[in-house]
């Protein structure tokens, strides 16, 4: 299907530096992130969610962490050093740290003295549990320090990574160094134990690599960047030892240890481990300019997106390994799609955008954010999904908490740090990646520039960007034009729109058309800007039918519905208690309408289409026309258990129904 031409053309004066051309030891990425701390979210869709995470979700995480489960109690025991018993799972420390990180972001967005006091209380307990040599892990302190660093699967470095991330976030928000000093001492212990002695170590659950790069940036100590690079280089060299490597159902593929990182070209194993690994590798490449990492990351990312990603941006189809199986194995009702994996896909895709300046990475980031990740958090803010299937016969429900509780604090920290993903910058250009009502002030080499976005996205495709440089000055403004607005739902060919849309995006500056075309997924406006200039972007949002490639057997003769960045589903609560009996023949048109009374306010889709029923005795099948309603996928399972499906049959033979 041909792509509609955009109503603007690219200005030829703009350019970007290719990461592939950057020499080693030269910063590789053309873009730098704009921190969430520089972005004030004033968005009708996201601001209530940030507030709810602060008011509801983080208090839930606190209560579960220190009252309903023994996580904080383990730190208290470790500090007493009286030989008490460890309670819970050996990686539980990480949930404390992720909750602290979410608290740090929340304090920046919504200052709360009581929350800050609680964070300081936890930090005191964490610091008291640290060993004199810098080691910090309550499981081994309480079960025997003689066994530390003996099983690479036991998440010691994973927990350390989340400690470091929390420490950096809390320091950046409050300026308080106590937790950062704890993290530095632990990182120094790890560096002295492994890299400086060249003692082999392969992380069984990657995370420390990306965390060390954050520590490097906040301390400006290249010791931590070298350690991150060293950990990456340990993989694929036969060093792995412990439960993962001894288990024939796992093995080195499970934790991406079969091939050295720079030689990896295909996605394997546990999805969250992979996302954290590749995020860390991209972070290292951004500093060192290591072309080997850049090429590996590009290839593996394309393998994920082209052959192993759900239309929701969810990844990791198999519950057996919480990860990837074989190409195009994307079942719907059995889909695993861990919330943390979608969160990790947001992290990694952002880093790839910064490395390359290509908008396709933000297209996938946006898809994962609005669909696969956001689905993990209930509309009430106090219930969660661990896995995110694309169909349900009624067996799926959100949970208050989990034994392995990585997802609640992970989605919390992502939502609270949303501002990290909205903008980026280069020396003389500003990049608008996400359409979120917000204000930011960004320094360029010619001076500071304030940008203000106003929009009702994702419900409407109109975005107004007001530009206010501190003085009249030339620079380039690059506004992402999403692939879904150009007849490409995702990069590659795994999904395509099954219908045509003649509507094209338009871009105006001060009410006048701009002669520009997209470049690398962006519309480039290169001009001398003055205070009060207004950029108006219109992204048409027709309801689109998505078809999957023939290789995805689960979705043959089915279509999914998408409007803007949102994937839709049909759920029992809107459709007479059923969702599996719907047929969407070719040519059926859906009408969008905003419903303030539905699911906190959503654009719902409606159409009259056939539904199938089977008589009680199973002797007859009836097809009758009925008005059906589809809702955004992220909003399902907020009204009790029941049927749901994303991929809707085009023919009666594909319908799954039960006798009435």
List the predicted regions and their residue ranges.
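Bacterial Sec-dependent signal peptides at the C-terminal "C-region" and cleavage site
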Residues: 17-27
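Bacterial N-terminal signal peptides
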Residues: 7-18
